Swiss-Prot record:
It comes from the Bacteria. NCBIfam families: cinA_nterm, PncC_domain, PRK00549.1. Pfam families: CinA, CinA_KH, MoCF_biosynth. InterPro entries: CinA (IPR050101), CinA-like_C (IPR036653), CinA_C (IPR008136), CinA_KH (IPR041424), Competence-induced_CinA (IPR008135), MoaB/Mog-like_dom_sf (IPR036425), MoaB/Mog_dom (IPR001453). Disulfide bonds: none annotated. This is CinA-like protein.
Length: 429
């Protein structure tokens, strides 16, 4: 039966189900980021998504999960289990569940061998199973790997889309092949346009109060998502055309930005670091870092952005007092009088880095990340941040709290320091 006809009969079932396959996921050895990413993508497309399941590399339990999905969902999306090893069982289990023979796709096997050869690997006989698919399945090409997926309608009203477990491969296949297919066959009568606004320095509850009326409206919808150091609002508009959907979305976007001011730092794939670097690039200015408790986290965030070298010159990880003295010029008296975690020292770190490394701006961070090392006067979670620029130095202490843990305190310090520089740049300092 043609795929389009099968999807037309899908009204008996509801929604999309995600099935993530892999014992490493079940045991918690690997974070299941695929399910979260796919859920956001489905929401952006306007496809109802009601269930997520994780199952290990076990034929019977995988088969049971698939057959359960048949009765309640019209689309099943699977990730994982498409590799060449014996515990990669997805394709053959799906075929067995619906009593459908596997057929080799010779052109696909040739392509897999070519990819392995180009990558300096020798194709093994085990890789040949990656060219086996149930009769009638449509191939989902994998541009980056040797594990293609498929779109298959084994029963009327039920479609399976399979993807490899490698997130980068799955995302590329989803965007290039699956989304166009879903728009054509997935029952999407309307076009959905989505935009993600990013906020920092404001709590989710406070943000929700500021935009409460917009959160309650129907089209576009506005949904909040909280993360470490930031809050996101996803705006999703529905229209007969892309242009119509954007006409609905843009005024809500503008209203949200107007109400929240500097708390909104960017949208979609923008990061705080990329926004800061763009602002510096527009001004023709440079930045360096001097880090203690963050251990290079601020520099790493900046260096992760393409073209960062145009404005990010480098930095110093001054963890010990001796390094602070030798590389940043911090005086012994200042350290003895105030301690490394203090306003005077972090200011001196920022000014020392800016002058010695020859940049327009510098960020300095010093704090108590824990779990030990805190005192009554300087508890775990206390972080001093300073940003030095052409017209002076702006410094402030932040108390992130002992309960957050070391890594969270470090990450929050990175976010806060980048945001401090962003605000100064926008202020015209």
């Amino acid at each position: 039966m043609p795929i389009a006809m099968v999807m037309a009969e899908a009204s008996a079932r509801h929604g999309v189900e995600i099935l993530c396959i892999g014992t490493e996921l079940l045991l918690g050895n690997i974070l299941n980021s695929n399910a979260r990413w796919l859920a956001e993508e489905l929401a952006a497309l306007g496809l109802p998504h009601y269930r997520q399941t994780v199952v290990g590399d076990n034929v019977e339990r995988l088969k049971e999960s698939v057959l359960e999905a048949v009765d309640r969902s019209r689309i099943l999306i699977t990730t994982g289990g498409l590799g060449p090893t014996p515990d990669d069982l997805t394709t053959e289990t799906l075929a067995a569940a619906f009593d459908t023979p596997l057929e080799e796709r010779p052109e696909l096997w040739f392509e897999i061998q070519a990819k392995l050869t180009a990558g300096g690997s020798i194709s093994a006989i085990s890789n040949r199973k990656q060219a086996l698919f149930p009769r009638g399945a449509e191939i989902l090409p994998n541009p980056s790997g040797t594990a293609p997926g498929m779109i298959w309608c084994p029963r009327p009203g039920f479609t399976v889309l399979t993807f490899p477990g490698v997130p980068s491969e799955m995302k590329q296949m989803w965007s290039q092949t699956a989304v166009p297919w879903l728009r054509q066959h997935g029952g999407l009568a309307d076009i959905f346009v989505s935009r993600l606004l990013r906020f920092t320095g404001i709590a989710e509850s406070t943000l929700a109060e500021e935009v409460a009326d917009l959160l309650e409206q129907g089209n576009p919808t506005v949904a909040p998502y909280a993360g470490l150091g930031e809050v996101k609002l996803r705006i999703t508009a529905r229209g007969a055309t892309v242009e119509q959907a954007r006409q609905l979305l843009d005024p809500v976007d503008a209203a949200l930005r107007h109400r929240t001011g500097l708390f909104c730092y960017g949208s979609d794939d923008e990061s705080l670091a990329s926004v800061v670097l763009d602002l510096l690039r527009q001004r023709g200015e440079t930045v360096v870092v001097a880090e203690s408790c963050t251990g290079g986290g601020v520099g790493a965030a900046l260096a992760a952005v393409p073209r960062a070298s145009e404005v990010f010159l480098g930095g110093v990880i001054a963890y010990s007092n001796a390094i602070k003295q030798a590389l940043l010029g911090i005086s012994t008296d200042l350290l003895h009088q105030h301690g490394a975690v203090s306003d005077p020292v972090v200011r001196a770190m920022a000014e020392g880095a800016r002058q010695r490394l020859g940049a327009d701006w510098s960020i300095a961070v010093s704090g108590v990340a824990g779990p030990g090392g805190g005192t009554h006067a300087k508890p775990v979670g206390l972080v001093h941040i300073a940003v030095a620029g052409p017209h002076g130095c702006d410094a402030s202490p932040v108390q992130f709290g002992v309960r957050r843990g070391r890594l969270a305190i470090q990450e929050l310090s990175v976010v806060r320091s980048l945001d401090q520089l962003r605000r100064l740049l926008l202020d015209g300092s």
